[in-house]
Amino acid sequence: MRPHGEGHVCFIGGGTMGCYNALLAALAGYDAVVYDIAWDSLLEVPQRVSEIAGEMAIAGLISPKAAQDASLRIAIQKDLKAALYGAGLVSESIFENLAVKRELFAELERYAASDTILTTNSSSLLVSDIEDAVIDGSRFAALHSHLGAMLFDIVPGPRTSPATLSRLQDYVQHLGGVSLVLKKENKGYVFNAMIGPVLAAAMLQVIDGAASIEEVDRAWMKRTGSPMGPFGMMDLFGTRLIYDSWKNRPAMPEQPLMDLMRRKVLSFLAPVVGTGRFGMRSGRGFYTYPAPAYAAPDFLQAHPESSLADYALTSAWTQNAVLIATNDVARPHDVDRAWIAATRQAKGPFAILDEIGLDRALTLFHVTGPLAGPENAGKVHKCLIDQLAQGRSGLQVGKGFYEYPDPAYAAVTFLSGSVI
């Protein structure tokens, strides 16, 4: 899709994600129309867009002039037929209710032109949950964005056409983003399927008294080179969002350990959210803003990090990365590409495994405990054993998941490489 070449882009849902995606489209030169069934929500769209643009400008991602110009290309519309008229692409970001989404997509198909691409930005529902609600599945797919990052997961359904995938990849390229076409659908896509377990491991370290918030974040920042740790990230995402994501998970009495973890996390987060500590936007979360402790020049040197926290977080991160690859959702290099695009870090989990050494990683997994379920643990173990059997134990021997001394992830073209 080209700016001004295939009509405007229609965004269904005037919440944060709808506004963020509309802003990205407008910044790339597209005309964007935001539709919402609630007039009150639509009236708040300009303010939401302005706040998001302001944060991007402060971060140095866009200029104030670009933000101002983009805002002029974003319109609001209460009438669905009018919003869809002339649209080349539709992106849905309404609340996560399957029945409502299915009804919406049936309606979108009735009113949109026959060549309009219909996409969902759902974070928790799968393509297979929704795609049969439309008659023409060739033009339906998931196009999943990440707030604050230029990573876009593209997930085709069984009927999605190659032409639709190509147009979506072109669209992401015009946005200046990185597209990751998943081989098959996966709960949490790729990045979220890794970051979720990392955040859970971080909270459990503090809940169980193994480390402090600062020790956990310091360990992660030293391991990954990230400018913030898991608790800083939760402040960035918003603590209410994290709390709601755990609250909306169904109870799992058949899995007592997972159910216990859910209850522990909710009890930990409840007083944070209950006292209005919503994160960066509210000025206070796990840290106080605009000058959080982790941003201090001496944060990494002032105190030692927790090695136990380092082991727990690294294990959760890398084991889930391996599981994504072994489940044939995405290749190891594409898993790393997703991580690097989303976090702006220099290395992804498979590069870190090479750095640790695959033999040592196996020991680490044994010490910290495997992923839930023997089947998953077996998959992770087999993947690393197979690599070791080929003499690919990591950086120290010059080959692991990458070839050294010039690993693919260090190339300037890595993020724009093949994603299929």
Show the residue positions of the predicted features:
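N-terminal glycine-rich phosphate-binding loop for ADP-containing cofactors
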Residues: 1-420
